[in-house]
Amino acid sequence: MSQEAQYWEWGSEAERPRLLHSMIRVADLDRALDFYCSKLGMNLLSRVDIEAGKFSIAFVSFGTDYYAGAIELTHNWEHPSNQSGYSHGTGYGHVAIGIPDLAGTCAKLQAAGVEIITAPKRLLPSAPALAFIKDPDGYNIELIQTSRRYPIPGL
């Protein structure tokens, strides 16, 4: 029994905690939704305007419900949409997405005007191929080739 298991006994899969979403701020919500839904193929789960807080949120996922893991796109109304985006600081790295056809996906994204930062390549012979792209707000997204040979992306 691992040390973590001694402290975290959750029982069945349904009782286990799960990562639900990660939030990023975007300068233009419509532009971000075009990128994540039209170009990456994610599903729009919900979109809500919160007038009291002066912001809008949208949840996108490759699944069909919130529990499949999502990205929350948040637009603060007082942030000028003519700015390129928010400062990401030095702490944010990237979001990683498993892609069955990495080369084909990168070709489609590039044809759609998406910036490819790192073309598909393997960092180690035993690791899956990966690529990096940038979303419209400058966030890095790692695309990892998924297959039966590499069941855990990134390892």
Regions found by a protein language model. Name each.
Residues 1-15, 56-59, 97, 103-155:
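Vicinal oxygen chelate
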Residues 2-9, 20-23, 34-45, 76-83, ...:
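Short N-terminal helix-initiation segments at or just after the protein's N-terminus
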Residues 13-16, 88-90:
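Short, low-complexity disordered segments enriched in Ser/Pro/Gly and basic
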Residues 14-17, 23-68, 111:
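Core segments of cupin and vicinal oxygen chelate
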Residues 19-21, 90-95:
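Eukaryotic phosphotyrosine signaling hubs
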Residues 30, 68, 81, 103-105, ...:
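Residue-level signal for secondary-structure boundary sites
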Residues 43-87, 133-136, 140-147:
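Conserved short beta-strand elements that form part of the metal-binding/catalytic scaffold
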Residues 67, 93-100:
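Short, electropositive, low-hydrophobicity segments enriched in small/polar residues
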